[in-house]
C-alpha cells in the first residue's frame, strides 16, 4: 500500500482548535517536522482538513 510523507510547512498559531488537533493527531509538532503515514481514507481526510498547512508527497 502507498504511503504519504506529510511535512508541516506553516505554524498552527492562530488556527482553529480542530486544525491544531488534526496536526497533533498526525504526529506533527514543529514546523518542518515530517511523518510517514499509510494512504488510507482516514489519513487523506485529515490531510484535506489541514492541506493549507502541510506538503504531502506519495512515497
Curated annotation (Swiss-Prot):
Q: Which GO terms describe its cellular component?
A: cytosolic large ribosomal subunit
The keyword Ribosomal protein is annotated on this UniProt entry: yes
**Keywords of this protein's UniProt record, alphabetized?**
Ribonucleoprotein, Ribosomal protein
Provide any one GO MF term from the record: structural constituent of ribosome
Please cite one Gene Ontology biological process associated with this protein: translation
Q: Which HAMAP family match?
A: Ribosomal_uL30_B
Q: Which family does it belong to?
A: Belongs to the universal ribosomal protein uL30 family.
| PANTHER family (alphabetical) | LARGE RIBOSOMAL SUBUNIT PROTEIN UL30M, MITOCHONDRIAL RIBOSOMAL PROTEIN L30
Q: How does it assemble?
A: Part of the 50S ribosomal subunit.
What name is this protein filed under?
Large ribosomal subunit protein uL30
Record the organism. Enterococcus faecalis (strain ATCC 700802 / V583)
Upper taxonomic lineage: Bacteria, Bacillati, Bacillota, Bacilli, Lactobacillales
